[in-house]
């Protein structure tokens, strides 16, 4: 899961697909943390949550690239979680 400034959405989509993801889901989110409160009222204040179901090795590559390219200059959080997929043929 990647939580990032909405301005990164297009770049993140390009990155995760290029790095081996078969798909993703993006939703608008709001919250508060180290980067301040993001309420999504203004376009520049929007935050997105990108969920990617993929093999662990692909997740590692995506996380390394996202951290390398964006973590220094953008509000960004990433985390891994293990899931049980009910329709594995889709992934």
Predicted regions and their residues:
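Positively charged, small/polar-rich N-terminal and surface patches that mediate targeting and assembly
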Residues: 1-91
